[in-house]
Every structure is written in C-alpha cells, then in structure tokens.
Amino acid sequence: MTKYALVGDVGGTNARLALCDIASGEISQAKTYSGLDYPSLEAVVRVYLDEHSVSVEDGCIAIACPITGDWVAMTNHTWAFSIAEMKKNLGFSHLEIINDFTAVSMAIPMLKKEHLIQFGGGEPVDGKPIAVYGAGTGLGVAHLVHVDKRWISLPGEGGHVDFAPNSEEEAMILEILRAEIGHVSAERVLSGPGLVNLYRAIVKSDNRLPENLRPKDITERALADNCIDCRRALSLFCVIMGRFGGDLALTMGTYGGVYIAGGIVPRFLEFFKASGFRGGFEDKGRFKDYVHGIPVYLIVHDNPGLLGSGAHLRQTLGHIL
C-alpha cells in the first residue's frame, strides 16, 4: 500500500499543497489555495486533507521566509505559527518547515535532463558544491553539498548582499538607487521590483521622468522592442544575473553547477539566451578561467518546491536520494 506524506510550497500569495509518495518521491494531486482566503496555514492543510480524504503522518512545507527556530512569521503574509504546535494539532509524526530555496536546492538531485536548460560551461562534477538562485518577488539563494550519501542544503539570505557594480553604467545605477533607498542589495536589482528599479534608474540617469510601469510592462515592451529604456533594463538585468551567479560560483567553487529557479527568467527565455548573461557570469578578471567550465542551468520543472520538499522529507525519514 502506498504511503503518502504532505508537501507544500507557500509564498506570499498562494499555498500549493500536494501528496508525495514516500517510497518513490512522486508528487501528485497538487492544488493551489489563495492564502488570503484562510486564517492560517494549518487551516489550509486541514482543508486539503479533507478534500482528498487522505490520512498522512508526515509533512514538509517550504515557506518563502527565513526559518530560524520553532516560531515562523511569514515575511509577506500575516500567517505566523509554532511548528511544534502545528505538528501536534495535525497529529503528525514529523513536520518539517523549510525555507523555499532549501526546497528548490533539494529538488536538484531529483531533476531529469528535460527539466533543465543549460547556458554554457561543461559537465557538472559529481560531489562538488551546487548553487541555486532565483529572481521573483525577491532574490532567493541556497547552496547544496553531498556528504556521506546525504544532500545538505545550506540556506541563507544571499539575495541581500551588496549590489556590486562592475561597469560605469552599473555604478551610476547604484548611485541613483542609493540616493533613493539607502542600502542597495542584489535583490534591489534582481527581482520583479528590481527590474522596475533598473528601468527607473536608467531613465533618471538621462534626466527624464520614468513612467509608472510594472515588471510585466517592462518585459513586454522590451520583447516588443518598442521601448529602448525597457530593453536596456532587461538586458542589464540579464547581465547582472550572470555576475551574481558567477559570484556564487566563486564563493563555493560550485563545479557541481549553478541553477536558476524562480518565475521571472522563463518569461523571456529567448531574450535571456541571446543576452549577456553568460558573459557576465564569466567576467571575473583573473578568475575567468576558473568559472569558464562551470555549467549554468535554468530549472523548467513545474513544481521544484514541492519536489524538493518531498526529497527533504524522504531523506529525513532515512531514504537515500
């Protein structure tokens, strides 16, 4: 008889829940709920389990916020809870609450070739560290290492490191944004809101007044090639994505590969392929040769957060991935 666990991927707006076959890791019966419709995450879980008439003893839910202890307070939502109390209330034997990019990193060993698009470099080296990052509402970062037949995710808040310009144009953008917002992190330029910041800074650098555009507007105008400022912002976004990925590669020696997740890049995939992304990745001066062979992959799996939550839980329960 198949034994299932509950897995989830929760962001600021939606909660996506599914079942994971503990033996195989297969994800099934995924359903998305609006977080605005429920008073708590526990309430959503109860609705899901009732709707699917399933009894589970174990669960793992990825959440887009730092996880530093038993108390979890979501960054972009009003939900807050005790992991221990939620586990007790649901009657679970195991309940893991992990960072969303911990889940994405744990999905990597489970991905197949059809779930990846490669951007330069050679073949990944088995046993070497892996980096994963992705731009969406924010900029998520994690690393992954393989030790004693176990995958260990190293989460953090790498998206909030300083934005490090490496050209006159990037330095000008830093100056403009710093005057507006103070500290300029990488996330301030590598995210949906970050794309807007790039566009606004480019226009303001020419002493013009920027329009009030959304990330979607900037992307659409750039792809239609009817707004030079939007196209420049998107081009610069791709280059800076490359620079940041190269920084991650240098920091951990990620010869196991660098992986890109998140919802932004797939929206302009062909543009990204033709951009200066890989050039930015390898633009490391004396260490260009060091990163030249490191492969970069775009994850195109539909639900890496659910897949990785399942992988994390299965490993916790003693399965070898």
Swiss-Prot record:
Keywords: ATP-binding, Cytoplasm, Glycolysis, Kinase, Nucleotide-binding, Transferase
CDD domains on file: ASKHA_NBD_GLK
Top enzyme category: transferase
Keyword Zinc: no
InterPro entries: ATPase_NBD, Bacterial_glucokinase, Glucokinase
MF GO annotations: ATP binding; D-glucose binding; glucokinase activity
A GO term from the CC aspect: cytosol
Cell location: Cytoplasm
UniProt-listed NCBIfam families: glk, PRK00292.1-1, PRK00292.1-3, PRK12408.1
Protein family per UniProt: Belongs to the bacterial glucokinase family.
Identification of the protein by name: Glucokinase
Organism annotation: Salmonella heidelberg (strain SL476)
